[in-house]
Amino acid sequence: LFTRLAALRGRRALLAAFGLGALAALAMPPVHAIPVLLLAIPGLLALLEGASSWRRALVLGLAWGWGHHIVGLYWISYALLTDPWRWGWLVPIAVPGLALPIGGFIAVAVAIAWFARPGWPRLVALAGAWVLLEMLRGVAFTGFPWNLMGSVWAFAALPVQGAAWVGVYGLSLVTLLLAGLPRLGRRAMAGGVVAVMALAGFGQARLAPEEPPPQPVTLLLVQGNVQQEAKWREDQRWPIFRRYLDLTAQGAQAARVPPGGRLVAVWPETASPFLLPTDAAARDYVARSLPPGGMLLAGSVRAEFGADGQLQRLFNSLSAVGADAALLGTYDKAHLVPFGEYMPLRGLIPIRVVQGGIDFSAGPGPVSMAPGGLPAFSPLICYEVIFPGAVTPTERPEWLLNITNDAWFGFSAGPHQHLATARLRAVEEGLPLARAAQTGISAVFDSRGQMLAHLGLGETGSLAVPLPGPGALTPFARVGIWIPLGCALMALLLGGLASIRRVK
């Protein structure tokens, strides 16, 4: 098969590259069909052997990356279907249009790998360049490190334990090296089997010790399951608020809080239809749903007004409300979603996708906060959790809190892929992570990424879980992306030194 792929030319080669990239997307959450990479990556290497120049390699890589991200990011079109009469015409354009520039990062990696000699030098060079371009994708423009190759292992805690050392980028490097081995022959594949067994053994050894004891806090994750179509309707504000209040009161009554402990309810991103930071009446209702000593951490819009009473700025925020209705603290989202929370190039783009008449403003971040004496945590709103190294190193928290509204994406792969990034952040930082999602998937992970409890997609209810204790400082938390960056650079250098080749 690989020999036939290497012989393809012209459009057939491009179609094959596109198909292999699309196939590779099945390795991503929630399918996790990792064996397809044993065809998709060696197939790409085979097609690369037939490329007559680095420019041809660039086009082949673009076709592979385009197919990969069209399939992997298909769920983005669901957000447009929440208002089909207004945005339905964008459905056939949005995903291919987004997938093309993202696929360009893979294209550049493939073009770089073309200069390496076929065989193991090219595989190593491809893996190194690929990971370097993944890192660049995580910071370029506003950054979009979604569906990184290392996330294919996030279906369970055991396969991702290496992220505590090398992060998800390091897992990407290992994944690409292992996936490309079939192109190198049976001996290489046998070595790959041994490597996988060794990695599994490492993961099992890291999971063997007992977790630190839980903290004296019981988290109550509240999942209101409010559909996006109803979320901002004026006539639904009170029913939605009432639903969250009732779920909180019922969950608090049923929760088993140990003596000396306290209950902390968590609502998802923008779950409150009212502005909790400035609406004292809404906070009074919240206080009535909390037990004595309890607290609510809720997603709520925060507004700033000028001296003339005119609205000046809006923030996508997390608000901490005490059982006495006092506002104990706020966090304003720092990493905003382009086109979702603000319009980039506003003067040049004639259409407006964001809701409302004003863009959201960004706050400072990342931060650690400890309202009302809670164990310090790092709040991550929505896709802030997809960025590795999302914890401030100067004020290391004791846990991570991710609140999100994935109702935009319905029953698609999007919420599952988002959840996978949360597991990876817990392992990388060695910190427990709690996640409250509007329509799911709400969950609690311990400091090694083991899921302790969850509410599934489309469920309505609450989940009471003791807050796990923090783990030891991981090498990745200590050093950050410098470890995977160094590994990727060494791989690229090794592949280059093994096969210095004249540029054609």
Place the predicted regions along the sequence by residue.
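Soluble catalytic domains of enzymes that build or remodel membrane lipids, polysaccharides, and related
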Residues: 207-482
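Membrane-embedded alpha-helical bundles of multi-pass enzymes
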Residues: 1-207, 411-412, 422-425, 437-445, ...
